[in-house]
Amino acid sequence: TDPGKVDYSTVASKLNDNNVDYDVFASSYYPFWHGSLDNLKANLNKVATNYNKEVIVAETSYLVTDEDYDGHENYAPKSGQSLPYTSSVQGQVDSVTDIMKTVSEVDSGKGIGVMYWEPAWIGVGNAYNDDGSLNEEKLAANKALWERDGSGWASSYSAAYDPDDAGKWYGGC
């Protein structure tokens, strides 16, 4: 649901009118598409207050670079699109920090979390040769990018807690 275009009270009202049993109301929020953080907070507050629901941002991300690594058009920045933060590691930190702060300020402690998403910002390439066989050199390069730019570093640090998985799936993607 886009908090910039939809009044969440309308959605929550329809769910309520149809006796839909749910615990948490979830929103997507991408700063370059979905309007202001004030609007997001107002929308989440309406659901939390009027329907006594916990709320989350279930999907967000922000770019660390605007370089096109894979030959596919980037979601942002696009012509005419204004970015509220710089395309940098610090811009990503600032974006996520502001979103987390906004959700934490939802009335009555009903803002319970933020989930970060969007591995498409990691510019990995195809790890296969034209004949379909695995190219070990390209795979190693992709793993290095995931280790640096994805959650690979977090998976590596978690090896002591889950040694059977941490080095196998590289963060799950």
Regions found by a protein language model. Name each.
Residues T1-A76:
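Noncatalytic carbohydrate-binding groove/subsite architecture in carbohydrate-active enzymes
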Residues A42, K46-T49, T65-D98, T102-K110, ...:
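Aromatic-rich peripheral "rim/lid" segments of glycoside hydrolase catalytic domains that contact
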